[in-house]
Design a protein with these regions (language model features):
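Single conserved hydrophobic/aromatic residue that forms the stacking wall/gate
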Residues: 1-14
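Bacterial Sec-dependent N-terminal signal peptides
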Residues: 26-60
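Bacterial N-terminal signal peptides
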Residues: 17-26
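Glycan-processing catalytic domains of CAZymes
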Residues: 51-527
C-alpha cells in the first residue's frame, strides 16, 4: 500500500511538469511576432566626419590664351616699366649734355660713389646684358657696369624675362614733364617705347602706355592729346598685344586726386583730358591717390566729389601705395579702415557697388610693391626691409584673397627708389658706395636759409631740404649735419641666399595664384 502511494506521487509530479511546459510554450507562441523570418540589420560602423573645404574667396578671372590679343586687364598681372636709365655713349641726345648724360642714374648732375652723388639704391645684375657701360664704381675685382634703356637689346632682354617668369606685360611710363617741350626726353622715351613694342610682339606680352602727369598743366592739354594721338595711330590701334579694356586700347593717367596747388592741375582738368582721350579711341585707367575713396591723407578732400565723378567715368583705377607703409605691421595697421590691407577690401567693395548700381563700370587694380629704398637721394628717409619677400607676398595674398581681378606691380626696373623686381645684385656683391672725397650732408627739414661752402669751396646759401657741404655747418632745426662716412650709405642688395631673379620668380607665382593655377596661400611659396 505504501509503494502504491509513492508511485502515485511521482506520476502527479510528471503530469504537473508536462502541463507547466505546455503553458510556457503556449505563452511564448502567443507573444511571438508574426514575422518569424525577420532579421535585424547589422549596425553600420560610424563614418568619420569629412571636413568642409572653405570657399575659395578668389574671383573667377579669364585665362589668357598664348598668342591671342589681350582683350582685358582681368586675369593679368602687369608691371610698371620706367625705362628711363641712360648713359654716355648710348646714342641718345641726353648724352650730349654733362648734366644729363647719366640719365636717371645721376644726382646733383653726377654719377659717382657717395650719397647725393648718385640716385640708385639697387644695382642691376649685368650678367645677361648685351651692351654694358663702365662706371666710376668698383667691385673688389673690377669696374662696375650698368645698362642703358636706350639700347634696344636691353629692353628686349627685359621683355624676355617677363615671358620667362610669367609676368603678363608692362605699362610703359611716359612722363609728361620729360616728353612734352623736352626734345631730349622725347628722344629717349620714344626709342624705349618703340623697343618695348617690339619686345611685346616677340615675347607676346601685353603692353600699354601710362602717362605720369608730373609736369602736366592745362596749357599742355593739346600737346599731350597730340602725343597720345600719335601713340594711338602708331601702336595702340595696330599692335596685336596692346592691352584693351571694354573693346578699346587702354591708356593710363597717373597722379590723380592729389592737391591741385601742388600738382598744377585739378580733377576737372583731368576729366577734360580723359574725355578727350576717349574721343581719340582709348579706354582710361587712372592712377589715383591712396585715400581716394574716403579722403584725407594724400587725397585732396575738398575735391573728393569731382574725383569720384572722374573715377566713375573711367574703366580702371589703381591707387598708389609706395611710401605709405614700409613693413608688414604698418600694412596691417596703418592708414584708414583698420589697416591698408582692409582698405583694399573696402576699395574693391566700393567699385563693385557702383558697378552693380549702374553708375559705372570701373574696375580696381590693386598695387603691390616688393619694398622701397632711396637713401642715396633722400638720406633722411628710412630704408624699408623686403623681409626676404614676405613683405611683398603679404600684399599679393591680401589683394587676391579679397577678390581682385587684376594686379599692378611697381616697378619692374625702378632701382632708384628700390622697388625693382628684375634681377639685382645680392648684398655681398654690390659695388662700393664710399666717396673718394670728404664732405658733409645737411638735412634741413624746415627749409631754413643756410650758409655753407659747396664742394668747390665756394660760399653759398640755400633753403634746400638736403644738400652737400664741403665743411661742417651748424645743424638746422630738427635736422642734422653728418659726414658722408658717418652716414655710411651703401647700395641695398637682396639677401645673399636668394637668387638675383628671386623677385621675378615670386611675382610670377602671384600671377598663378591670381588665376587659381596654384593654391591660395598666405605663406610665400618655396622655390
Amino acid at each position: 500500500l505504501m509503494r502504491s502511494s509513492a508511485a502515485s506521487d511521482v506520476y502527479k509530479r510528471q503530469i504537473y511538469y508536462l502541463v507547466l511546459c505546455a503553458l510556457v510554450a503556449c505563452t511564448t507562441a502567443s507573444c511571438k511576432d508574426s514575422n518569424d523570418d525577420y532579421i535585424p540589420p547589422a549596425l553600420e560602423p560610424e563614418k568619420p566626419e569629412v571636413p568642409v573645404e572653405p570657399e575659395d574667396p578668389r574671383a573667377d578671372v579669364p585665362i589668357h590664351v598664348d598668342g591671342e590679343p589681350y582683350t582685358t586687364y582681368k586675369g593679368l598681372l602687369m608691371t610698371g616699366y620706367q625705362g628711363w636709365f641712360g648713359t654716355p655713349g648710348d646714342g641718345c641726345s641726353h648724352a650730349n649734355h654733362k648734366n644729363t648724360e647719366w640719365y636717371h642714374y645721376r644726382e646733383n648732375d653726377m654719377f659717382k660713389p657717395g650719397v647725393l652723388r648718385n640716385s640708385i639704391d639697387l644695382w642691376p645684375d649685368m650678367s645677361e646684358y648685351e651692351i654694358k657701360y663702365d662706371t666710376e664704381f668698383k667691385y673688389p675685382d673690377g669696374t662696375a657696369q650698368v645698362y642703358s634703356a636706350y639700347d634696344k637689346s636691353t629692353v628686349m632682354l627685359h621683355f624676355k624675362w617677363m615671358q620667362e617668369y610669367g609676368i603678363d606685360g608692362a605699362f610703359m611710363q611716359r612722363f609728361v614733364g620729360e616728353v612734352i617741350d623736352n626734345p631730349d626726353g622725347k628722344d629717349h622715351f620714344d626709342k624705349v617705347l618703340a623697343s618695348a613694342m617690339d619686345g611685346s610682339d616677340q615675347y607676346q606680352r601685353a603692353i600699354a602706355v601710362m602717362y605720369d602727369l608730373g609736369g602736366y598743366n592745362p596749357a599742355r592739354f593739346e600737346k599731350v592729346v597730340a602725343d597720345a594721338q600719335a601713340i594711338y595711330d602708331t601702336y595702340a590701334s595696330k599692335r596685336k598685344y596692346y592691352l584693351h579694356e571694354n573693346g578699346k586700347p587702354l591708356i593710363a593717367l597717373w597722379g590723380v586726386g592729389f592737391n591741385p596747388a601742388e600738382r598744377g592741375y585739378s580733377n576737372e582738368d583731368i576729366q577734360k583730358l580723359s574725355d578727350k582721350l576717349k574721343e581719340v579711341g582709348y579706354s582710361i585707367m587712372l592712377g589715383v591717390s591712396t585715400y581716394w575713396r574716403a579722403g584725407g591723407g594724400d587725397t585732396y578732400t575738398p575735391g573728393r566729389a569731382s574725383l569720384h565723378a572722374l573715377i566713375k567715368s573711367v574703366d580702371v583705377i589703381m591707387p598708389w601705395y609706395v611710401g605709405r607703409f614700409n613693413d608688414i605691421n604698418s600694412y596691417n595697421t596703418g592708414g584708414s579702415d583698420g589697416g591698408f590691407a582692409n582698405m583694399v577690401g573696402k576699395d574693391i567693395e566700393w567699385c563693385k557697388n557702383v558697378n552693380e548700381s549702374g553708375e559705372s563700370k570701373v574696375q580696381y587694380a590693386p598695387h603691390c610693391y616688393p619694398g622701397a629704398s632711396d637713401l642715396n637721394m633722400h638720406p633722411y628717409y628710412e630704408r624699408g626691409s623686403r623681409e626676404r619677400g614676405k613683405f611683398f607676398w603679404t600684399q599679393l595674398h591680401n589683394c587676391i584673397r579679397r577678390g581682385c581681378t587684376m594686379l599692378y606691380i611697381a616697378m619692374f626696373d625702378e632701382i632708384d627708389e628700390g622697388t625693382a623686381i628684375y634681377k639685382v645684385l645680392r648684398k655681398s656683391d654690390v659695388p662700393s658706395n664710399a666717396a673718394d672725397v670728404e664732405y658733409y650732408v645737411v638735412y634741413n627739414p624746415k627749409n631754413e636759409k643756410i650758409s655753407y661752402s659747396d664742394m668747390n669751396g665756394i660760399g653759398r646759401s640755400t633753403e634746400n631740404t638736403v644738400f652737400m657741404a664741403k665743411n661742417k655747418v651748424t645743424a638746422p632745426t630738427d635736422g642734422w649735419c653728418k659726414s658722408e662716412k658717418e652716414l655710411g650709405i651703401t647700395f641695398e642688395g637682396i639677401d645673399d641666399d636668394l637668387e638675383t631673379d628671386y623677385y621675378l620668380w615670386l611675382t610670377g607665382q602671384a600671377g598663378k595664384m591670381l588665376r587659381k593655377q596654384i593654391a591660395l596661400q598666405e605663406t610665400q611659396p618655396k622655390r
